[in-house]
């Protein structure tokens, strides 16, 4: 399973989108949390765009019940396009058309919410025997070049799986999966272990896992035989720890901007930050914020 093979380019990505979005109820009672907009663009579109900008051309979205709106968003909308064309709204017509041409997007349903590892496993037939990326929808990562593009380059240079890490305050390490490093590695990028939400004061570092992975397909065999952990879920971290015994996993130390849009405060911050960067909104938003804070 772990014999050396010719390195392949990373062209496929998995975006897990099966969660119930309970933190955003009642807004998510009848719509996917992934479709909640950051101003005028749903959160999941930012994730898809990062994948495409990083060289991904085929994406599988692992969804659940009541997620049809995601499929509709990335599909062609004949009626809307016709309406925009008749109104002469060429700018918006181009934006709407571009959405359906971002990438080849496929869908598979995760029939039960059995954890991130299970969601990744649901895409096994689509991925086959190729290296692949995983992008979590709660994390909008912003950097130039994109985080995933840098990780793919690292994978293609080394042939090793890569996990994105971000430095967090020590008093916040209990909220994240935390990496321990192999001190014998001169690059200090070889991950020795992954500890899921260590107890306060027990973290081996303050480098936390954020929602980007580039993985060898060997992970599927480990996920297939993984034992359910807490709440009966199959955890990706457990199988990554096993993979690390046979094939080195490397860190990509992300230093850009991360928005946690799976958290209410993070969602509000993301909306404000994106608004402040837009020519059509920034001046009025700054004015409003100054008025509110004075």
What do the predicted segments below correspond to?
Residues 2-15, 23, 37, 41-134, ...:
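Conserved N-terminal catalytic core of the sugar/cofactor nucleotidyltransferase
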Residues 16, 136-137, 215-216:
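A secondary-structure boundary/capping signal
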Residues 20, 139:
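Active-site metal-binding loops of divalent metal-dependent hydrolases
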Residues 108-110, 164-165, 252-254:
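Conserved beta-strand termini and adjacent loop/short-helix elements that scaffold enzyme active sites
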Residues 141-221, 226, 230:
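Conserved core of the sugar-phosphate nucleotidyltransferase
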